[in-house]
Amino acid sequence: MNIKWEISESDIQKITDFVNQHKNPFVENRIERNIYRRNINIDKDSVLRCMLMCLLTTQQRSGPDSLISVFLRQNPFPLTYTIISHVEDVEDYVRWVLQNNSLNRYINKIPAFFATNLSYLEDTKWLLLLNIESLLEDRVTKQTERIVADSIDQSFKGFGSKQARNFLQALGLT
């Protein structure tokens, strides 16, 4: 059996119009980073922000107008590496920042996971940065992505395989 597709100019125009009507800045940004590999910034701050995003969004609403999204878009962001590296008790500070932004769900677990994960990053001298930067290479395989995601899943407290994949996707690496 052979199937012959005939696509007219009007078909193409209908699809183009549909896509243009449903454009979304979030989706456009993801396409720019994850497909075209542009505007990807991998550093300690982006890792910490993405880690926190994954911890916050595990079981909470996180649409574009949610408290989580508003918090994560703050500029300057209140939980940069420069700030938290000078804080005596990271867990308490993260809890305080989250509470001041009305992010009270799992208010004990999330700061504890964040502090533990930061300690892991520090103890390993941020080896994770090298591992995830390797995903910026041109010829990355799905197997390499899976190895890095599995490493994140096993290393970060409060993470599972879904959070590990979301983490890499949010950074623009998958």
Where are these regions (language model features)?
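Phosphate-backbone recognition surface of nucleic-acid-processing proteins
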Residues: S155-K157, N166-T174
